[in-house]
Amino acid sequence: MKKVTAMLFSMAVGLNAVSMAAKAKASEEQETDVLLIGGGIMSATLGTYLRELEPEWSMTMVERLEGVAQESSNGWNNAGTGHSALMELNYTPQNADGSISIEKAVAINEAFQISRQFWAHQVERGVLRTPRSFINTVPHMSFVWGEDNVNFLRARYAALQQSSLFRGMRYSEDHAQIKEWAPLVMEGRDPQQKVAATRTEIGTDVNYGEITRQLIASLQKKSNFSLQLSSEVRALKRNDDNTWTVTVADLKNGTAQNIRAKFVFIGAGGAALKLLQESGIPEAKDYAGFPVGGQFLVSENPDVVNHHLAKVYGKASVGAPPMSVPHIDTRVLDGKRVVLFGPFATFSTKFLKNGSLWDLMSSTTTSNVMPMMHVGLDNFDLVKYLVSQVMLSEEDRFEALKEYYPQAKKEDWRLWQAGQRVQIIKRDAEKGGVLRLGTEVVSDQQGTIAALLGASPGASTAAPIMLDLLEKVFGDRVSSPQWQATLKAIVPSYGRKLNGDVAATERELQYTSEVLGLKYDKPQAADSTPKPQFKPQPVQKEVADIAL
């Protein structure tokens, strides 16, 4: 009994010592101009902008894991697509009269051109090195079957020809031509099946994890930048002078410190919502989050990998979220080509792949519980879809693969759990709450703290998203001649649209392709694909979209 008592006393003394050490360390404040929470591509991109705009500003980045780019930015945890709406059919919804709306597709493509310019500029500065290590040319294709879907794709193709951003896209309903583009997709397919495809040669596969690592490595070369790994934010408190005191725990030794920052960016992926709530700013009360995970089938068999060089996206079935459609993609990961098929939706209450099962519950508050309930009630089809995905068997996933790869063999594929995506739920005056696809910058009125919520298109538009953030929280500086000149050096098309300007579009694509080592041939005249005859479509209930 004495030994047990002594042991318990010793443990109590030890825990008390750790607590005292933490308090002592927390009293030693570190000061910084900018605190970046999260070691992913968003923080890395914002830090890189600010390094050029205000090189004298001090910056501190804190990351909970033992390395940067280990969550959603990691190449294995996302689809690696340079989202530019060349093939993603959910960005071109069909109107009731059968016509195709291209506004969202144009906006997505414009955004990706900004990312390309940003990366090209960093290559020229020596910040990013060896472009092939993070971006490669992979043709983007849309592929559909069935008469209705073929009619849709034909109409989509015709509509996109109105934009200078989509010049060079090709369309075919010929089995032989499509087989030449994507042999793996066509071999073994019923020759009588009605199919159609579009193909754009300038599509890309992007390793966002590699971009993140290289950007942060460059930031670390400056003495006024500090990276703290295995460091978790435990508290955020606004000070009287509108600076922030952020308590950060060292997960390795149990100590803590306070960081006093003039500006805080929460770029923590799925954890951003909880940290935004922790800040106490009133703007956070409008938001909730719902986590959805993704799985991919992966093949590294050379017989499969060498037979496929494209990202091939299909069309979602009726009642499924538009972005849920699987796609079969060439990827370049860890220096080698692989093929991924998916994603298949999974459910976990974690907000991060390396998160806690309590994440969903701990982010639910009296302010956002009702919007969450409204979203659940209003989107029964989405709930049904997620349940059906969670219930998929190995055989079900393989049958889905065979729709895109008829001659697939089970032994060539393994299942991989990718990252978590926290969907935005926002309070809505009419509906109570709505599920929003996309990303959203949330900041306080003073512009001292900002968070990025949401998931799609995410990393591929990190550069324009962070530009939006700069305009939102540093508006006066952005309008200054100094910042304007620097931003236009980083992004040559900053402040103007490429869409509708053929010469400007070709100039920027030529420039970024040369610097990034990507394929680009000046588009020829559009082919003679028959113009679609629009047919009225039955009005269907809109299905909320999600990012996987």
Swiss-Prot record:
Q: Does the keyword Kinase apply?
A: no
User: What EC number is given for this enzyme?
Assistant: 1.1.5.4
The UniProt entry, under InterPro entries, shows: FAD/NAD-bd_sf, MQO
Q: Which GO terms describe its biological process?
A: tricarboxylic acid cycle
Q: In which pathway does it act?
A: Carbohydrate metabolism; tricarboxylic acid cycle; oxaloacetate from (S)-malate (quinone route): step 1/1
**Keywords per UniProt:** FAD, Flavoprotein, Oxidoreductase, Tricarboxylic acid cycle
Q: Which cofactor does it need?
A: FAD
**SUPFAM superfamilies recorded for this chain?**
FAD/NAD(P)-binding domain (SSF51905)
Domain of life of the organism encoding this protein = Bacteria
Read off the HAMAP family from this record.
MQO (MF_00212)
Which PANTHER family does its entry note?
L-2-HYDROXYGLUTARATE DEHYDROGENASE, MITOCHONDRIAL
Name the family.
Belongs to the MQO family.
Mind telling me what this protein is named?
Probable malate:quinone oxidoreductase
